Amino acid sequence: MQADLYPSRQEDQPSWQERLDPVVYRSDLENAPIAAELVERFERDGYLVIPNLFSADEVALFRAELERMRQDPAVAGSGKTIKEPDSGAIRSVFAIHKDNELFARVAADERTAGIARFILGGDLYVHQSRMNFKPGFTGKEFYWHSDFETWHIEDGMPRMRCLSCSILLTDNEPHNGPLMLMPGSHKHYVRCVGATPENHYEKSLRKQEIGIPDQNSLSELASRFGIDCATGPAGSVVFFDCNTMHGSNGNITPSARSNLFYVYNHVDNAVQAPFCEQKPRPAFVAERENFKPLDIRPQQYL
């Protein structure tokens, strides 16, 4: 077991530490699958939005399959869904790269996974995948957090060599609850307060209350770095570092949001025992044993 380089949830007062790991693991930017300045932007800000990476026809295909799964009683009863805390409507369906042939192919699409492979510097596997819905009028907010804090403490992910990829299936506009991020926050790790409860994921995936930063830390991060919204038309893709501070507002507009979400982790950064006193989260939330490196290649869907 590796040493705990990013402790959290151990003290009664929050604290900060500087990031110990690179953000971009390759320096040969001339060989990057995207423009060098985009890689440099990811290094600086901790996220990147690439508009129109997928075509309108591809998005329509993905949305049709997403809606089919959303209405499938077998999916609803699979134990791999998260529902809105008030309405009971499906918010997320997990493990789509394992349970759905189409979305398994999307996980290995060179347009997205190839970028992740370059940034992380080698072979990848999918730590987590899901499709997300934020309905119009009733979509709830999700509070500020660093994904890595949870993946480290509750899943045992040793280092910051992981990133998320969100494929937008609807237009993300400032008014309909898009992802908000603090540019530059990924270079600072906020140690949170509060012991991890048993089976915490059952509640935290609906509304996280443990493993969230204190308000003073959030205020300081926002003061230093500001807050940006990841907006773009359907077919755009948002890449963001595992430690970038992010969250989203509720959606009280008629404009629903949905996306496909893949977490790419380097194979050398596979999870181990959690850095807390609880058992690991289930595999549909955090892949632990049955993974192999992605066979990243161009994909044809139409």
From Swiss-Prot:
Family matches, as Gene3D superfamilies: q2cbj1_9rhob like domain
Could you say which residues bind L-ectoine here? Q128
Q: Which SUPFAM superfamilies does the entry link to?
A: Clavaminate synthase-like
- Asked if the record carries the keyword tRNA processing, the reply is no
Q: Which residues bind 2-oxoglutarate?
A: K134
Q: How does activity depend on temperature?
A: Optimum temperature is 35 degrees Celsius. Active from 10 to 50 degrees Celsius.
What does its pH dependence look like?
A: Optimum pH is 7.5.
Q: Report quaternary structure and partners.
A: Homodimer.
By sequence similarity, the record places it as follows: Belongs to the PhyH family. EctD subfamily.
Name-wise, this protein is: Ectoine dioxygenase
